Design a protein with these regions (language model features):
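Short glycine/serine/threonine/alanine-rich loop segments
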Residues: 6-7, 78
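Short, glycine/charge-rich flexible loops or terminal/linker lids adjacent to PRPP-binding catalytic cores
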Residues: 7-53, 119-122
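Glycine-rich SAM-binding Motif I of class I
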Residues: 63, 67
Length: 124
């Protein structure tokens, strides 16, 4: 996505690594998929006032991960301009919740999954 828009990429990390030095922004993020809470970290060197941020994630279920990242963006003084996800689980509340907060685009929205047959119903 960043390559298409010709903008920099900033990764939010679940653990402090040696390439994240100095002051950081941090927030707690609940992962529906993994059933646990993570501390998400972004170096203050890469995010701050005047930045415009588009959040990108692979899956959207209950919206807690993107909600936590949006809080981190707000805490930094940057502006959240929208969010994009690859797959949204439309049968869970995350998409509706986030659309009340910011512009959200999903490449695919799964409206139903049949556990017995494995059939997936996509939103049109």
């Amino acid at each position: 996505v960043a390559e298409i828009f010709d903008v920099p990429v900033v990764f939010a990390k679940k653990t402090q690594t040696k390439n994240i030095a100095g002051d950081v922004y941090t927030t707690k993020v609940e992962s529906f998929t993994h059933g646990r809470v993570y501390d998400i970290i972004v170096s203050k060197e890469f995010l701050g006032e005047g930045d415009r941020v588009l959040l990108i994630d692979d899956f959207l279920a209950n919206g807690k991960a993107l909600e936590g990242l949006a809080k981190l963006v707000k805490d930094s003084g940057a502006e959240l301009v929208g969010a994009g996800v690859v797959i949204e689980k439309g049968f869970q509340p995350g998409g509706d919740f986030l659309r009340k907060q910011t512009h959200l685009e999903s490449l695919a929205i799964v409206d139903a999954m049949d556990e017995k047959t494995g059939e997936i119903t996509f939103r049109e």
